[in-house]
A protein has these predicted regions:
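Accessory terminal helices/loops
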Residues: 11, 19, 225-227, 239-307
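Acidic/histidine-rich helix-loop elements
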Residues: 37-52, 126, 130-133, 203-213
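Metallo-beta-lactamase
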Residues: 62-64, 70-72, 162, 169-254, ...
Length: 307
């Protein structure tokens, strides 16, 4: 029995090692802004939900954190990486949108003030039970009595609000519908840094499902590219420079115009794959998970616009 117990303990230890999170990639942007970059998959039982990026902005007495991870365990893992660059507490969390991989981890930071757009806050408040259930099912991680943090401070739709938080000047931009109806862009004018949420992703197939692609292209053109950007932390993937933003904009713009052209010429949804430059999309992560649903979503969007 003693040997069986030892074997069981070893199996448990081996299992724990097997599912350990990969290290957070910490990138210093400047003396007070750091990117915490994670893997780029979709939440599943292999990655246990660690698929996200976070921006750390070190203020006078505390940290402003952009997004919070998929759940408490992921947030704890990211926080350990944060503590390698500063011991200051997280006092504010800026949530870029309501998708659960970006905010369910906020409950880990019990004393932090959470800010988001009005739409995002409503989605979290009304949908938190299903969000928790879905993330638990997808990742196999049990959250116990998870109680997602509903944002206490909200940004009105379509507004641009300048704020000073912890001595740091920020502009919080609630743009038109892009990745979702309630995206929040966080602009640091003194640093030239933009945290875009999933309005921008890098080497990752974007998710069009909850947004509007034509409007999304407009947000990149009229809002993001109007800023004197030096560095972008996207929702997923490596840091971006201006050339990367323009390349992404052109890809999603071509995607929309290809679907629209086929529709207006009385083609079929099945024709889209024959006309898109699929090779460039295949080179990016999440291709298999996203391409079919993205084509369908944009086809329905174009159909509605021309009904």
């Amino acid at each position: 029995m003693r040997y069986l117990g030892l074997i069981f303990s070893l199996l448990l230890t081996t299992s724990a090692w097997a599912v350990a999170y990969p290290p957070v990639k910490v990138e210093r942007i400047n003396e007070r802004v750091y990117a915490m970059l994670g893997p780029t998959g979709i939440p599943n039982k292999d990655n246990r939900g660690f698929v996200n990026n976070n921006l750390v902005i070190i203020g006078d007495e505390g940290i402003i954190l952009v997004d919070a991870g998929s759940h408490r365990d992921v947030a704890k893992h990211i926080h350990a990486a944060i503590r390698t660059v500063t011991e200051k507490p997280v006092t504010h969390i800026l949530v870029t949108h309501h998708h659960s991989d970006h905010h369910l981890g906020a409950e880990y930071y019990e004393d932090a003030e959470v800010l988001a757009t009005e739409y995002c806050a409503t989605q979290i408040r009304d949908g938190h039970v299903s969000m928790v259930e879905s993330m638990q099912r997808r990742t196999g991680v049990s959250f116990g009595g998870a109680n997602p943090s509903v944002p206490q401070t909200t940004i009105p739709h379509g507004s641009r609000q300048e704020m000073v938080i912890q001595g740091v000047r920020l502009e919080l931009i609630s743009a038109d519908t892009a990745h979702t109806k309630g995206d929040l862009l966080i602009w640091l004018p003194d640093d030239g840094v933009l945290a875009s949420g999933d309005v921008l992703v890098h080497y990752v197939n974007p998710n069009f499902y909850d947004g509007n692609l034509k409007s999304w292209v407009g947000v990149v053109d009229n809002t993001i590219l109007s800023l004197p950007i030096k560095t972008v932390m996207p929702g997923h993937g490596p840091l971006m420079q201006l050339d990367d933003v323009i390349r992404f904009r052109n890809m999603i713009g071509d995607f929309y115009s290809t679907v629209e052209k086929i529709y207006l010429e009385d083609g079929e949804e099945a024709d889209v794959r024959k006309n898109l430059d699929l090779e460039q999309w295949k080179r990016m992560d999440r291709y298999d998970a996203m391409i079919g649903r993205n084509i369908n979503k944009v086809w329905l969007e174009v159909e509605e616009a021309n009904f």
